Amino acid sequence: MALRWGIVSVGLISSDFTAVLQTLPRSEHQVVAVAARDLSRAKEFAQKHDIPKAYGSYEELAKDPSVEVAYIGTQHPQHKAAVMLCLAAGKAVLCEKPTGVNAAEVREMVAEARSRALFLMEAIWTRFFPASEALRSVLAQGTLGDLRVARAEFGKNLIHVPRAVDRAQAGGALLDIGIYCVQFTSMVFGGQKPEKISVVGRRHETGVDDTVTVLLQYPGEVHGSFTCSITVQLSNTASVSGTKGMVQLLNPCWCPTELVVKGEHKEFPLPPVPKDCNFDNGAGMSYEAKHVWECLRKGMKESPVIPLSESELLADILEEVRKAIGVTFPQDKR
């Protein structure tokens, strides 16, 4: 039975996700509605992607009984309102990362989803790439021996992107791209809470975080570290080292297709790329869409791959890190 999607917001990421959904079997995925705060933009998006219904408000989409699951592709500060609206209307929700600007927002959304017994998942698409799944298998099999260190880097010059440096839009490196690094170390060490977090970094002149390096001490004398930046290019790789070897996700580690296990190179080709994809390896969004279908058809209320408790943990870590370098957002005071 097809999962009936409603798309909330008509930005670039929503366009990619919609295009990818339409490469999947119609027996499993159908996009039935789209909403924007401007009806003309919603209609334009609907025409481009052949979507039957277009709405000029998110409220109208939330009330549409034909929508089973909402995909939230708004900018960070609008995530909470859109998620809460859709949950209140009884919809399952897949929300782009980060689910919330701060930990309080994430906890409020999680509590709402649980109280209503509705599915909610943070769209950390990285976890569902076959290369990431293969890495988890390597770790589970003990191929690397006793784990010691996990390391990730993600840096691009994004200064030309207005929202990346806009404090009002919760810009900066941590929430936009650093979350990919944090989720990596968390995945490696089983979603454990770090015992200690050490941070060095610099702020951009607009008040957002510019470049940040973080050391996370986990139970068992193992540690993770990462650097993220919106002003410099980094290696954009991730690795795990143990007493018997190392495994690496090659660039781009946030949407990986190549894995090196103890020197052995493995490739995981993407499915066919939809036309007009805006982001690197956008076809890989199909993996998380398939996972949502599986979860909902099994009656699950959250994903076992990125459970809500881990979304809360990631939000806690990101908030602690940015506050350590003096970065706050307007949403923190609400």
UniProtKB/Swiss-Prot annotation:
The keyword Hydrolase does not apply. It catalyses: (1R,2R)-1,2-dihydrobenzene-1,2-diol + NADP(+) = catechol + NADPH + H(+); D-xylose + NADP(+) = D-xylono-1,5-lactone + NADPH + H(+). The keyword Oxidoreductase applies. One of its GO terms (biological process) is D-xylose catabolic process. Its EC number is 1.3.1.20, 1.1.1.179. InterPro entries: Gfo/Idh/MocA-like_OxRdtase_N, Gfo/Idh/MocA_domain, GFO_IDH_MocA-like_dom, NAD(P)-bd_dom_sf. GO terms for molecular function: D-xylose 1-dehydrogenase (NADP+) activity; nucleotide binding; trans-1,2-dihydrobenzene-1,2-diol dehydrogenase activity. It comes from the Eukaryota. Gene3D superfamilies: Dihydrodipicolinate Reductase, domain 2 (3.30.360.10), NAD(P)-binding Rossmann-like Domain (3.40.50.720). It is an enzyme of class 1 (oxidoreductase). The record marks Y180 as: May play an important role in catalytic activity. The record marks Y71, H79, K97 as: May play an important role in coenzyme binding. This is Trans-1,2-dihydrobenzene-1,2-diol dehydrogenase. It comes from Homo sapiens. The lineage of its organism: Eukaryota, Metazoa, Chordata, Craniata, Vertebrata.
